Amino acid sequence: MMEGQQHGEQLKRGLKNRHIQLIALGGAIGTGLFLGSASVIQSAGPGIILGYAIAGFIAFLIMRQLGEMVVEEPVAGSFSHFAYKYWGSFAGFASGWNYWVLYVLVAMAELTAVGKYIQFWYPEIPTWVSAAVFFVVINAINLTNVKVFGEMEFWFAIIKVIAVVAMIIFGGWLLFSGNGGPQASVSNLWDQGGFLPHGFTGLVMMMAIIMFSFGGLELVGITAAEADNPEQSIPKATNQVIYRILIFYIGSLAVLLSLMPWTRVTADTSPFVLIFHELGDTFVANALNIVVLTAALSVYNSCVYCNSRMLFGLAQQGNAPKALASVDKRGVPVNTILVSALVTALCVLINYLAPESAFGLLMALVVSALVINWAMISLAHMKFRRAKQEQGVVTRFPALLYPLGNWICLLFMAAVLVIMLMTPGMAISVYLIPVWLIVLGIGYLFKEKTAKAVKAH
């Protein structure tokens, strides 16, 4: 593709394989693990490890379903394109807009977390101030070009990977060398009331919050339109997700919960930072706080990228205003970045009005949108595969356990919604789902009416 052709309608293919790999990783290691895991530990105890394994398996199935579609048709807008093409125009419209809203909400949650991490050092700084500062900085960087985004995300993710691996190694050394003190023992995983101290119910009730940690893995699909070689980079990035889950989620939590009894974890501080702080290692606690701050900024950076590309894809499909389907001479969709930023700025207001409850509220809304998102990926994939089979096409990167895997994912989503209805503070976000679907329906009818009026003239 020539440079001159990219101005107006085409995104620039500026992401290398290493960028794709690390963007997937950036989506997987964020606030869900570093901050969200605190409330899960309080309810499920060491059983959180099993919870992450179950949710990780579901996330991997979803990733493979999306991966199969993206390898066959690498386009901007990712799965909303597949919902549109293989399911119907309303499905494409609804899934695209839901995905955009999902990542606006994730962006808000990450900015809120940034404020909490800054308060570890400066408790007097309100969360909304930190959110506002980083909001401006990250959006300004994303207005440059996709290579700058790719490089920034690459280094953000490198920092996270090195830090988590170092934390596992250092934690393991403290554990087995005796330098972690008398309380550091693998027996902490079952001694403090058992592996599941509140029974299996305690774990089940936390599955919605655990699911929050995995939102972002599907970013790989969004990068497809700007990947140099999607046929190779997408399968590679997708398959490596399972190892990341094992190492970064399960490995780090197993070490962490062995170093100190899970009962010492508090809900409003990163357990990663807290445990090393409690062990008296201030240097490591400060270093880890830098890492969790980097993690939140990394995911927010990915959100800015993702939101703008999804909105760009919607505009190309005719599901968003045409002005959003343009890029500047560098191949950057400036209009969609600015529109997404404008809505995300509400986060600053939410943190100003309700600093204590902002993160919990945003997390609940994210999970509801994520349930819709993952369910639509699974359903769109079933229709995609059926269409390909009828055409006699053998796909290059088939999903696992089709169609059983799809039904397992859909049942899991339904179970998460039921759990949320039973969880104080989360039920409201489930009640908002029908309202949101009605809003989408009205938006779709308005779009169709406008399109017909334009054709008539």
UniProtKB/Swiss-Prot annotation:
Q: Give the superkingdom in one word.
A: Bacteria
Check the record and name the Gene3D superfamilies matching this protein: Amino acid/polyamine transporter I
Residues passing through the membrane, by range = 20-40, 43-63, 87-107, 118-138, 156-176, 202-222, 241-261, 272-292, 334-354, 359-379, 400-420, 426-446
Periplasmic compartment ranges equal 41-42, 108-117, 177-201, 262-271, 355-358, 421-425
Q: Name one GO cellular component term.
A: plasma membrane
Pfam families in the cross-refs: AA_permease
**Which locations, inside or outside the cell, does it occupy?**
Cell inner membrane
| Matches recorded under InterPro entries | AA-permease/SLC12A_dom (IPR004841), Amino_acid_permease_CS (IPR004840)
- Spell out which residues lie on the membrane's Cytoplasmic side: 1-19, 64-86, 139-155, 223-240, 293-333, 380-399, 447-457
Task: Give the record's GO biological process terms.
Answer: amino acid transport; transmembrane transport
Kindly give the PROSITE patterns that the UniProt entry links to this protein. Answer: AMINO_ACID_PERMEASE_1 (PS00218)
Main localization, broad class: membrane
Provide the reaction this enzyme catalyses. L-phenylalanine(in) + H(+)(in) = L-phenylalanine(out) + H(+)(out); L-tryptophan(in) + H(+)(in) = L-tryptophan(out) + H(+)(out); L-tyrosine(in) + H(+)(in) = L-tyrosine(out) + H(+)(out)
Fetch the PANTHER family from UniProt: AROMATIC AMINO ACID TRANSPORT PROTEIN AROP, GABA PERMEASE
Protein family (similarity comment): Belongs to the amino acid-polyamine-organocation (APC) superfamily. Amino acid transporter (AAT) (TC 2.A.3.1) family.
Explain the purpose of this protein. Answer: Permease that is involved in the active transport across the cytoplasmic membrane of all three aromatic amino acids, phenylalanine, tyrosine and tryptophan.
Protein name (Swiss-Prot/TrEMBL): Aromatic amino acid transport protein AroP
Q: Which organism is it from?
A: Shigella flexneri
What lineage is this protein's organism placed in? Bacteria, Pseudomonadati, Pseudomonadota, Gammaproteobacteria, Enterobacterales
